Each structure stands twice: as C-alpha cells, then as structure tokens.
Swiss-Prot record:
Function: Catalyzes the ATP-dependent conversion of 7-carboxy-7-deazaguanine (CDG) to 7-cyano-7-deazaguanine (preQ(0)).
NCBIfam families for the chain: 7-cyano-7-deazaguanine synthase QueC (TIGR00364)
Signal peptide positions (record): none
Binding site for ATP: 16-26
Chain's gene name: queC
GO MF annotations in UniProt: ATP binding; ligase activity, forming carbon-nitrogen bonds; zinc ion binding
Protein name: 7-cyano-7-deazaguanine synthase
Cofactor stoichiometry and binding remark: Binds 1 zinc ion per subunit.
Pathway annotation from the record: Purine metabolism; 7-cyano-7-deazaguanine biosynthesis
Family stated for the protein in its record: Belongs to the QueC family.
Cited Pfam families: QueC
Cofactors named for this entry: Zn(2+)
Binding residues annotated for Zn(2+), in chain numbering: 193, 201, 204, 207
Originating species: Mannheimia succiniciproducens (strain KCTC 0769BP / MBEL55E)
One Gene Ontology term from the biological process aspect of the record: queuosine biosynthetic process
Amino acid sequence: MNITNPNGDRKAVVIFSGGQDSTTCLLKAIADYGVENVEAVTFQYGQRHAIELEKAKWIAQDLGIKQTLIDTSVIKTITANAMMDNIKITKDEAGMPNTFVDGRNALFLLYTAIYAKGQGIRDIITGVCETDFSGYPDCRDVFIKSMNVTLNLAMDYQFNIHTPLMYLTKAQTWQLADELGALNYVREHTHTCYLGVEGGCGSCPSCILRENGLQQYLASKQ
C-alpha cells in the first residue's frame, strides 16, 4: 500500500465494523495518516451474528491497528429491527427497511467522540454513504454535519468527522479499494451479509448491493 500520510502526525479513529465500507475507510486512513496514527473503534450493539465482530478483530490485528470494542448492546432493549432480532427483512409503507437501527450512527459517533477526545484525537472517520444508503436517514451528509456541530458544542472540542465514501456508489467504493491496492483483501476478508453467512448469502439486500457494485466496477475495467 502506498502510504502518503499528508496529515503529518495527526491521528484518526475509524468507526470499524469489519464490513466492506469501514474496511476501505480503515485502509484509506492508514494511507493518509500512517498505521501508527490510526485506531479503530468497533461496537457490539446486539447484532445477530458474531462473524461481523470476528472479522473486525482479525482485520485490525492483521493491519496492526489498535482496536477498541465498545458495548452498546443496551440499545437492543429499547428498539427492534432485523439487524438485532431474528425476523424477516422487510420494508415499511414508506420504503424504510427494517434493517435500519434507530439511533445507531448517532450513538456510534457519540461514543467514538468521547473515546477520541480522551486520546487527544480530533479526526473521526466513518463509512456512511448517501449514494447507496438503503434509505437510512443517519447515513445522510446533512445528519453527519449536524452531528459534527453537536459533538463540538457538547464537548467543547474540535472534532472533524470525515466521510470518504459519502457520495461514492458501491462500484466506486470497490474502485477506491483497488486504488489502495486492496481489492482482493476487501473481497476476501470483509463481511457484509445481513444473515451472517460466511462469504455472503448472495440474496440479502446488503449482499446484492455489494456484488452488483463489484461486477459494475470489474466491467468498467475491461
């Protein structure tokens, strides 16, 4: 991987799930900041499948990144959705999928900011995306910008929330991984499947989005 490190000695923390998007963000952060200046925060929020946490742990260790696991599973007691409960994936009348976890990204950003301030870190990186965001309201740029202001005011600290994938399609996210020299790494080691199937089930919305994006990118290279 080409380490450009344009940020000098600045440090960054990546919200990291072990999925395609957050792993691509982690790899980009390593290129931009240097591996010694990057940390990862992973959340146990009551997700149905342990494979997600296992992948995140393995990748962090493989890349030499300090990983901090934060337990926010209390959210499971106050909300229900297909990410935490054994229910069929559906959409409501407005088109919102029941894989949406109310408050999840707000909670992740809050806890990451608390951790970051304690470590003297100002740059927070998250892989949310408004282009292929499945209708999740907390993946929108307007939410991230609002949360950035709120966190700065709440803690009297200058956080900078970076969203390198915000306006990329899934195909462009694969392209970014390729430009980082990590296309095969992301293909082989990340987990995206909502059903927790190793290598992907191929039929859930997340697997379909991932595979369609990959095929679009590979076709564009020919």
